[in-house]
Amino acid sequence: MGPRALLVLLVATAWHAQGVPVIQPSGPELVVEPGTTVTLRCVGNGSVEWDGPISPHWNLDLDPPSSILTTNNATFQNTGTYHCTEPGNPQGGNATIHLYVKDPARPWKVLAQEVTVLEGQDALLPCLLTDPALEAGVSLVRVRGRPVLRQTNYSFSPWHGFTIHKAKFIENHVYQCSARVDGRTVTSMGIWLKVQKDISGPATLTLEPAELVRIQGEAAQIVCSASNIDVNFDVSLRHGDTKLTISQQSDFHDNRYQKVLTLNLDHVSFQDAGNYSCTATNAWGNHSASMVFRVVESAYLNLTSEQSLLQEVTVGEKVDLQVKVEAYPGLESFNWTYLGPFSDYQDKLDFVTIKDTYRYTSTLSLPRLKRSEAGRYSFLARNAGGQNALTFELTLRYPPEVRVTMTLINGSDTLLCEASGYPQPSVTWVQCRSHTDRCDESAGLVLEDSHSEVLSQVPFHEVIVHSLLAIGTLEHNRTYECRAFNSVGNSSQTFWPISIGAHTQLPDELLFTPVLLTCMSIMALLLLLLLLLLYKYKQKPKYQVRWKIIESYEGNSYTFIDPTQLPYNEKWEFPRNNLQFGKTLGAGAFGKVVEATAFGLGKEDAVLKVAVKMLKSTAHADEKEALMSELKIMSHLGQHENIVNLLGACTHGGPVLVITEYCCYGDLLNFLRRQAEAMLGPSLSVGQDPEAGAGYKNIHLEKKYVRRDSDFSSQGVDTYVEMRPVSTSSSNDSFSEEDLGKEDGRPLELRDLLHFSSQVAQGMAFLASKNCIHRDVAARNVLLTSGRVAKIGDFGLARDIMNDSNYIVKGNARLPVKWMAPESIFDCVYTVQSDVWSYGILLWEIFSLGLNPYPGILVNSKFYKLVKDGYQMAQPAFAPKNIYSIMQACWALEPTRRPTFQQICSLLQKQAQEDRRVPNYTNLPSSSSSSSSSSSSCRTGSGGGSSSEPEEESSSEHLACCEQGDIAQPLLQPNNYQFC
């Protein structure tokens, strides 16, 4: 047996073992040099076939069960993938081998120079590498060496070429395959990639105008425009069956190709009238639109109505009178007019007119019709061709009215019944025994007057009829009733004949029986109770918006804008479904503030932590209106870095929600007190619950604390309502002491206090520039966010002012008296200057590290006298002299002598610059120095500053203040309430 036969036998044996054709030489790839003889043998169980780049240079030798491909001079053109299949094998299967003919002069074999795909499909650029060793240095470039677009996503296979994945229309270019050969770049011939738009529908088509009317001789224009995502589409304009030859304008706009046909007619004639159709054709199909062009001899104005011109409507109902107008040229004027007959009806008629090219529809609405609105209503229209009118006659139907009188006719007693109404009423008489206001169904019919005398029948007025009933001799204890009715309703009136001899009177003692007296007493008691409850309700404080916006002023007389009249911009509306609520940050008498996560606020993928204000479910309508007013004021003011800014709102589909910035470090007052406790120690700091975190919540707890009015410890009931998280457990706080450790752990420096003061002043200057008065400037209403940035807010909603002794009852409101200017306390005058006074109190809070203003002084008549006489608090322990001078300027009794917030900002900026130049002011005093400062402050007394009282009396008061520091007593006394 020869070697060749043995080889065939071995290959056949291997194929039977595998069940698929086998190619020799084995292996997925074969690399040869140019000019080499290449032999590919495929062996199967039956006849086999070759598939691949088989050119005439290949010789095919069939030797079943094998097939042999041979070429004596291999070139780079023979590079490619060759497949061997066995058609007769039911199991299918094929064998594959890839042939490389590595030609250094031709590293690429390009199978096609043009590739067309739909947008979004993968595009294969068939440039095959002839040498697998060059794969590391291949790349894809655009023609003339330009790089591919940055967004082009492609991959490379040496067997197949480059594949651009999900080709885009913008990637329509000529590409070249590039390889590094012996240090130089060799590119293939160009391959034009054509990316076509996926035509999923017809071209967009517009034919304007939709309807056209012209007078003979006028000019006209018809525009047919079409747009398509691909340039391969046509557009045509036809008049009837005739295709018009019109020059076409092309453009590319908004990623669409546009083609426009414009027909201009300078002098139209009747031959130009008719149907015009515009057709656009693309790969998907045709799309057509048509219009009608009418040519008329002259202008016209036609008025019609689908309603009857004679209208009858029941009084109290609504009617709409509608007129349809066809006019060319368009209407110059039109109006509805009431033509009478009731001259006292002068109300402005409410009508709506809708225009549609050459047609108008005007509708006059008459709601809840009154009798005086009956009459003629005329619609009058005018255009260049003249004028025309259409008149409706409106008659009102209403039930009868009856009046019965008695008269003598021919010496006989006669009852006269006058009935008026529309339509004409019919009259019947009945009588019943005894005196009664109305006869029942058992009453006997006396007369059915079907021929009542018509006294008056005027158009648009009621019809008045008379009916007479002769009763002869009067009978005592009998009632006569006249009944009138029409299609709308009925009415009646009774008449009692009075007999002089039959008159009787009840005894006086029967008028006030014990039962009657008891009922009257109970009614009086209930009335008193109702009045008492009403008084208590009126005295109950209501949730009000503290912020006010000035509309105008004259002297000290201010006119404020009604916030309910401010517009609400729907741009603030935010889907309530995109809010994920967390814990309650604060809860007060009227509502609460809840932590929430807002999804898509500002940007679609944004996730932002926010604070959401909402009312309690038991809120009254005026409180809901107040929250809506607060929302309108915040949106009216706009944004500023140093106010708690509005982020959005939910006003539809549920309770009103106001979305504001979330300030993670809570209010400034608690922040200062935490810092004071950390710096000075518990014995010298203000009271603070160790479990209380920084937040918004009002918690009223009875606990041990350090007295805030001085620097001495005491025990009692803490009545300051702090803003803290709902849960006092540190494990449940999202912002616990551990979370705030980094921020709180940084030592509090003088520059921090100056920054707080300056930031609040900048926020107040912004509010003043917007003519806005805050009316509750205090450290508790200032929040701190990351970076120790102070933001002004108003948290009356989430503060339990019912139990906060800082708010004193005056009238039916609770007011922060210790922070209020004299003119606000005594004259109820609130201005920007009164906010400046409150800002001075806020400065005192900041530089005393959170002490309560006017320490040791109760809010009573003596306190009011001190304020009126110009009493000022002493310089705080940590305030530089210049800062205390600003406080004193803010506390000037004459409002006009107080500085503006802009001036305060300048003064604080100057002080901050001095602080940077003087190192001694960088850090606040230590515990020892603070202690001495506190003692010094006590010796100086709370009465530092100007006072009109004698010095001796003031000194005794200061000494008494210091003596009180040694006595354990509540921080704020329970009798801090003053009624206006």
Curated annotation (Swiss-Prot):
ATP binds at residues 585-593, 613. Autophosphorylated in response to CSF1 or IL34 binding. Phosphorylation at Tyr-558 is important for normal down-regulation of signaling by ubiquitination, internalization and degradation. Phosphorylation at Tyr-558 and Tyr-807 is important for interaction with SRC family members, including FYN, YES1 and SRC, and for subsequent activation of these protein kinases. Phosphorylation at Tyr-696 and Tyr-921 is important for interaction with GRB2. Phosphorylation at Tyr-720 is important for interaction with PIK3R1. Phosphorylation at Tyr-720 and Tyr-807 is important for interaction with PLCG2. Ubiquitinated. Becomes rapidly polyubiquitinated after autophosphorylation, leading to its degradation. The modification Phosphotyrosine is found at residues 543, 558, 696, 705, 720, 807, 921, 977. CDD domains: Ig (cd00096), IgI_3_CSF-1R (cd20936). Residues 21-100, 107-197, 202-297, 299-397, 400-499 form the Ig-like C2-type domain. Its EC number is 2.7.10.1. It is found in: Cell membrane. The keyword Nucleotide-binding applies. Residues 539-571 are annotated as: Regulatory juxtamembrane domain. PROSITE patterns: IG_LIKE (PS50835), PROTEIN_KINASE_ATP (PS00107), PROTEIN_KINASE_DOM (PS50011), PROTEIN_KINASE_TYR (PS00109), RECEPTOR_TYR_KIN_III (PS00240). Residues 723-743, 918-959 are annotated as: Disordered. Residues 794-816 are annotated as: Activation loop. GO terms for biological process: cell migration; cell surface receptor protein tyrosine kinase signaling pathway; cellular response to cytokine stimulus; cellular response to macrophage colony-stimulating factor stimulus; inflammatory response; innate immune response; osteoclast differentiation; peptidyl-tyrosine phosphorylation. GO terms for cellular component: cell surface; CSF1-CSF1R complex; plasma membrane; receptor complex. The chain crosses the membrane at residues 515-535. The active site is at 776 (proton acceptor). It comes from the Eukaryota. Its main location: membrane. This is Macrophage colony-stimulating factor 1 receptor. It comes from Felis catus.
